[in-house]
């Protein structure tokens, strides 16, 4: 039985991506500036992982009246109390930020007493977590180091596999994706916690993977069509990998959409940020990391070097 590969686009497509190079650069610069301004104005909504505080997970015997609960707990005078559903409508997450260890137990008991005195529900407390401010700072440092090491490892890999200018193209695309993702986080007020660090690392990996696929095809076509100029080769390479790129992004977005719809509040920030990052990474691999190679076109590509490179 013969198996036919799934194709979303015709085998031969000749869309002139390079013709939109200046437009895409301008668009990306504008988006990056908006993201930087948003970060400066709105900051980040740091979660308890980073700023410290209390998390209480509780299951109720019926659907709670969240607006009334927020009002009652907000009147306790212990700071901003955040209530969210996760999993089901009867599962509740209660978060109180910036609590010190000195009044930790007092605040927990105060919240429990207020719930029992004001609501006729049966409460099943499933988890009570506390993260101190010192631990939060350590987690921020660890998350930052994880991102820096991932950048470094990616640059070394690209430099070994391709050439330094390919690595520079991917670095610029990654910085673009990172700035847009951080700006999106600040504008949408997504929780900035350990799961969002994982989301950023996922976005970096996805963006690099997309760019490497196109770069690999560019290197192959440089060997095959050494008489063509670099602009024609980049256009050809993007078009040849376009069906694969679109199919990959659709299947990945659908899988991630399931996490957004059914994963619950606990992984909402992760899922939404990855969804946005996949779109940004796909865009940057086509319209930034590949076209930016034309900046080095005047420094003639040494095709013999590519022929010998494995």
Curated annotation (Swiss-Prot):
It is found in: Cell inner membrane. GO terms for biological process: intracellular protein transmembrane transport; protein targeting; protein transport by the Sec complex. Coiled coil: none annotated. The chain crosses the membrane at residues 20-42, 140-160, 164-184, 194-214, 246-266, 272-292. InterPro entries: SecD/SecF_arch_bac, SecD/SecF_bac, SecD/SecF_CS, SecD_SecF_C, SecD_SecF_C_bact, SecF_bac. One of its GO terms (cellular component) is plasma membrane. GO terms for molecular function: protein-transporting ATPase activity. It comes from the Bacteria. Keywords: Cell inner membrane, Cell membrane, Membrane, Protein transport, Translocation, Transmembrane, Transmembrane helix, Transport. Its main location: membrane. Pfam families: Sec_GG, SecD_SecF_C. The keyword Transmembrane helix applies. Part of the Sec protein translocase complex. Interacts with the SecYEG preprotein conducting channel. SecDF uses the proton motive force (PMF) to complete protein translocation after the ATP-dependent function of SecA. NCBIfam families: 2A0604s01, transloc_SecF. Forms a complex with SecD. Part of the essential Sec protein translocation apparatus which comprises SecA, SecYEG and auxiliary proteins SecDF-YajC and YidC. Belongs to the SecD/SecF family. SecF subfamily. This is Protein translocase subunit SecF.
